[in-house]
Swiss-Prot record:
It comes from Dictyostelium discoideum (Social amoeba). Residues 641-658 have a biased composition (Basic and acidic residues). One of its GO terms (cellular component) is Golgi transport complex. The gene is cog8. Its main location: Golgi. Component of the conserved oligomeric Golgi complex which is composed of eight different subunits and is required for normal Golgi morphology and localization. Residues 544-560 have a biased composition (Pro residues). This is Conserved oligomeric Golgi complex subunit 8.
């Protein structure tokens, strides 16, 4: 055990010794290496020392910049919330605008401007300011959009205040922006509130909307811009009134164009009332345009009235052309007069008058009175006093046109009847024609009498009541008292207007019977040639008298006379042709004298030219007549002949003339042909020494045996020139018809003439009127 230990120790010692030897060797090697390294380091340091110095300096500078960056980052972290708020200003401002938080948006805009003044070179601040400008434009657009909506006065003031705080616009520019925005709202409100409807509803809604909205806009404008300084130009006040003038002009144009489609008087009155209320409402802010509305409504009211009465007149005249007058039954004139007077008295006692019942007997007059009363009712609702004189003038023209149309119709009818009598050789046809015409005269005279005494006075009275009511209302408005107006205060002289009609139905023909030869038909011997400026003339008709002789006056040798002379006064003051009236009754000469006395001056004025013109024609046919006093007789001899009268009829006529004539009695079938001459009141002619109407009427010429021979020669000459005279009659009738049409363009009597020419041959009339009162024969 010990040996082992000894061996181990020896081994250990040997190892230690060996280790020591090795360590010594290693130490020597290390020392050598260290020496070598130190030498190398020393040599390297000495050679690389400048490089090391520069590197240190570089490191030092880098470390300094890093230190500064570190400090700035640390400062940024410390102020992160503030910087975040600045960066979020544009986004926050946009959010405020969208939420209508205009105060906060304006505060952010003001804060951004302050930052920009301090850090105008900062890139971040510049970018923020660019975004702020975009948001500001959005803010202005939003504020203007609010002004284009239905906004209250408070919000208007706030909105304009926001625009003022932006300091972008001047005061005048703000006014223009305000009015432009509110005008857009007004246009849109009118566009959407007023839908397609009838014209009255459209104007009513338009007027109400304009009245409310324009008044609000003007009130808002005055409230917002009332505190401005007076150093501004006075033209600033014109901004508002120019805008108002434009709006009123547009409104008036719309009213003017829309009223063309409104024909009801009550509707026009309703629109007028709303328009006047509109003007009166905005007059509280200094705007009153009622004077601009008056001519517009007056124009449309007058046009509607004229259109209605023109249509009524045209319808009446056209109806008159084709209307067949029923032959009148024998009625008591007293009862008709009583009914008319009672109706008129009852109507006068009532506030609302009714048409006379006599108008119902004539369909054209009944239709005409309905149309005219309709136009009066339309006019009554909206009748301005300023149109009174114009409407009176138009009403007078209407009455003249109606009277002229009826007179022209009558004249053409009788002219056509004369042509039929001349051209018809048949005794039966001539007798039938004259009998029908005689029956027709009674009906037509009743028609003219109703027109003159009932229809026209009733129309004038109705219009007088309308004028009186308007004048009373105007008087009450002016001084609070009502004034009563006298009857027919409108100044229309009814008597002068219906004078021509009265001459038609009040003319009484004087019939002088001829011989007892009843085998011959009543042939018109002499017919006056028509002249539109001729004086009252006479025609002759051989009739069948009673055998009672009467003394005859002795005429002068130079004056040829005719067997029968009848005369009547001119039926119309209007220009027309010479016509002939057929009458089967013996008329009273006194009434005829009265009618002639009324127009004596007019007849004398036109007598000279007629006599002079006809004298030349008479010289060609009758060499024995040279005096101007015989012109009427010569004219009659030239114009009324029968083309187909043979020698037998001529001899019978001469025999009839030799018989004594009685003016006291006449047979039932005697027919007197009466010439009614209508002188022209519009043509001026010099008056000469001619016989007055009274002298012609009072003188009923009787045939004289001395004159018979002259008449034979005259009749012979007349028969030779019958073709020429007949042509002259037709030519004169055409000239008269042309002149009538020029005076009344709406009247064309040609269809009437053609219808009447064809009618008499088809109508059978019993001459015994007393036994056939129930016949309902029409002409």
């Amino acid at each position: 055990m010990s040996k082992v230990n000894t061996d181990e120790n020896n081994f250990i010692n040997n190892n230690n010794s060996n280790n020591n030897i090795n360590n010594n060797d290693n130490n020597d090697n290390n020392n050598n290496n260290i020496q070598n390294v130190s030498n190398q380091i020393e040599n390297g340091l000495l050679s690389n020392l400048p490089t090391i110095s520069s590197s240190c300096e570089s490191f030092s500078s880098k470390s300094h910049s890093l230190t500064e960056r570190r400090s700035s980052i640390k400062n940024l972290l410390d102020n992160f919330s503030t910087l975040l708020d600045i960066l979020e200003i544009p986004q926050l401002m946009d959010t405020c605008i969208k939420n209508n938080s205009f105060d906060e948006a304006l505060q952010l805009e003001s804060f951004a401007k302050k930052i920009y003044k301090q850090y105008s070179n900062n890139t971040v601040i510049i970018e923020i300011i660019k975004e702020i400008k975009v948001c500001t434009r959005s803010l202005i657009s939003t504020l203007q959009q609010q002004l284009r909506q239905d906004i209250t006065l408070t919000n208007c003031i706030k909105t304009i205040g926001y625009l003022r705080r932006l300091s972008i616009y001047k005061e005048n520019e703000l006014k223009i922006i305000f009015l432009h925005s509110r005008d857009q709202w007004l246009i849109n409100s009118l566009k959407f509130d007023i839908t397609n409807s009838n014209h009255v509803t459209y104007l009513t809604k338009l007027t109400d909307s304009c009245r409310t909205n324009i008044f609000d806009i003007v009130t808002q404008y005055n409230a917002i811009f009332s505190n401005e300084s007076n150093d501004e130009d006075q033209l600033d006040d014109l901004i508002l009134y120019n805008w108002i003038q434009q709006k009123i002009k547009v409104y008036i144009n719309i009213v003017d164009s829309t009223l063309n489609h409104i024909k009801s008087g009550s509707s026009i009155s309703y629109v007028l009332e709303n328009s006047m209320y509109f003007s009166m409402s905005i007059s509280r802010v200094g705007i009153d345009f009622r004077n601009l509305l008056e001519p517009i409504f007056e124009k449309h009211i007058l046009n509607n009235f004229l259109s209605q009465i023109t249509t009524a007149n045209h319808h009446f005249l056209e109806t008159l052309k084709t209307y067949k007058f029923p032959l009148q039954k024998s009625t008591s004139p007293t009862s008709s007069t009583t009914s008319t007077s009672s109706s008129s008295s009852s109507s006068s006692s009532s506030q609302y008058i009714s048409p006379p019942l006599s108008i119902l007997q004539h369909q054209p007059l009944a239709v005409l009175v309905n149309l005219i009363l309709k136009s009066f009712n339309e006019l009554k609702d909206c009748f301005p006093i300023s149109l009174r004189s114009i409407v009176i003038l138009k009403l007078k023209e209407l009455i003249i046109s109606i009277v002229g149309g009826v007179t022209s119709f009558y004249n053409q009818l009788l002219s056509n009847t004369i042509s039929n009598l001349i051209n018809s050789p048949s005794t039966t046809t001539t007798t039938t024609t004259t009998t029908i015409t005689s029956s027709f005269d009674k009906v037509f005279h009743s028609f003219c009498k109703c027109l003159a005494e009932d229809f026209i006075p009733f129309i004038v009275k109705c219009f007088d009541i309308i004028c009186s009511q308007q004048l009373q209302q105007q008087q009450q408005i002016n001084d609070g008292s009502s004034s009563s107006s006298s009857s027919n205060s409108i100044g229309i002289d009814v008597d002068s207007l219906v004078l021509s009609l009265k001459k038609i139905y009040s003319t009484e023909t004087q019939t002088i019977p001829s011989t007892q030869n009843n085998n011959l038909p009543p042939i018109p011997d002499l017919v006056l040639r028509g002249n539109k400026n001729s004086s009252p003339s006479t025609t002759t008709t051989p009739t069948t008298p009673t055998p009672t002789p009467t003394p005859t006056p002795t005429p002068t040798p130079t004056t040829p006379t005719t067997p029968t002379i009848t005369h009547s006064t001119p039926p119309s003051p209007l220009p027309s042709s010479t016509t002939t009236q057929l009458n089967s009754n013996n008329n009273n000469n006194d009434n005829n004298n009265n009618n002639n006395n009324n127009n004596n001056n007019n007849n004398n004025n036109n007598n000279n030219n007629n006599n002079n013109n006809n004298n030349n024609n008479n010289n060609n046919n009758n060499n024995n007549n040279n005096n101007n006093n015989n012109n009427n007789n010569n004219n009659n001899n030239n114009n009324n002949t029968d083309k187909k009268v043979d020698e037998r009829k001529e001899e019978n006529i001469i025999k009839e003339e030799e018989q004594p004539i009685s003016t006291s009695t006449a047979n039932k079938n005697d027919i007197a042909i009466e010439t009614i001459t209508t002188p022209s009141s519009f043509s001026s002619s010099s008056s000469t020494n001619t016989k007055s109407d009274e002298e012609i009427i009072d003188k009923i010429v009787q045939p004289d045996p001395v004159v018979v021979e002259k008449q034979e020669n005259e009749i012979t000459n007349i028969l030779k020139d019958d073709n020429e005279t007949t042509t002259d009659i037709l030519t004169d009738n055409n000239e008269a018809t042309t002149e009538i049409q020029n005076n009344d363009q709406s009247l064309n009597p040609d269809p009437i003439i053609q219808e009447i020419e064809d009618t008499p041959s088809e109508v059978i009339v019993n001459n015994n009127n007393n036994n056939n009162d129930d016949d309902d024969t029409t002409f």
